[in-house]
Amino acid sequence: MRITRDVFDKITIGLLTIDKGRKAEKEGEQRLLFAMLGYVPVINHNEDGKPTIEGYHISISHTIGYVAIILSMDFEVGIDIEYVSNRVSRITSRYLRSDEPFTDLRSQLIAWCAKETTYKLFSEEHLALQEMKVNVALNHVTNLRSNIDIKFVSEVTHDYVLTYAWK
């Protein structure tokens, strides 16, 4: 388990290794939230399916072997984690724009995660993946619908790629 803070302690990021399966994901969420908050909050979901807890902005992501959570009382947040595999390379036409010519797996994974993070951050807009433009070199995404630029943080390991952002 790892818990870190960002933006002058206004954001908390948690990462936990878990077993496979839906039950392990839910148990992992509860363990991680307890470690982050000192209690297990009630998680509700809004009409878009986005998780909500009282007093915090929250985003949750799962991938094989991991659960990641980001919390903030002050900022809207988004997070995504993806295990390293060539799965995203097979579907680049679904999420990469013609002006995002990422050919290496690392860049493709970062672009995928950054777009998923951005989608969560702007959940009320229901953005299509083609309505976001990623600059992997600058850790930057543009929401093309509302012309808003955001910076994202990325972490790349041999097991996973993690991105998160706030606004």
For each predicted feature, which ranges?
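Core catalytic alpha/beta fold that binds nucleotide/phospho-ligands
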Residues: 1-167
